[in-house]
Amino acid sequence: MTAPDDLELLRAVEDSLNKRWPEAKIDPTLDRIAALVDALGSPQLSYPTIHIGGTNGKTTTSRMIDALMAKLDYRTGRFTSPHLESVLERISIKGAPISASGFVATYNDIALYLDLIDSRQPHPLSFFEVLTAMAFVAFAEFPIDIGIIEVGMGGEWDSTNVLSPSVSVITPIGMDHAAYLGNTVEEIARTKAGIIKPESHVV
């Protein structure tokens, strides 16, 4: 059970996040998230990762990989979106959502860096960019053995695409977010394939 004080602090953090550049307002660039993780010491590079993109089945695939890794006794960190009931669902450690106190502590750890990057960019960091960075930091601090990271939208310029994944997974691709990703399945596939890195295996 979450303590009342933790819930109050969580609501305050959520209020701050919800005032940021919204997820639905797309600005296709990695400049802000790249600057933020660089300032934080690139926590996303401190553990191996599996990066999951595609149109359908990303979250299901993420959960399946998480369960498999847990069976093999790996300490897992999983970042998915969107959430159904609580923002805590987006950041899971060892198969369970991060605690309210852990979420608040992670936000407080990076808050000064958020202000720094906001002051240096044409647009402030978005809601999703901040949550992405929080997941990277929470996983590094736990620490985990492997990170399972789901793309938010697209791939090439999604804020999760500052990883150097061991494995890049592409689930089935269809017509989605055509206004941002392309007008054909081929164009959308090309954008989503942006998570494939030279050093990664591809599934």
Where are these regions (language model features)?
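Residue-level signal for inorganic ion chemistry
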Residues: 17, 55, 76, 148, ...
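Fold-independent oxyanion-binding glycine-rich loops
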Residues: 80-82, 150-153, 172-173, 191-192, ...
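ATP-dependent carboxylate-amine ligase catalytic core
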Residues: 9, 30, 35-45, 71-163, ...
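Internal gly/pro-rich beta-alpha loop/helix module
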Residues: 166-167, 180-203
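A conserved segment at the C-terminal end of the G1
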Residues: 48-52, 60-80
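Charged, amphipathic alpha-helical linker segments immediately N-terminal to NTP-binding catalytic cores
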Residues: 1-25
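Conserved Switch II/interswitch segment of TRAFAC-class P-loop GTPases
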Residues: 172-180
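Inter-motif core of Ras-like GTPase G domains
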Residues: 161-172
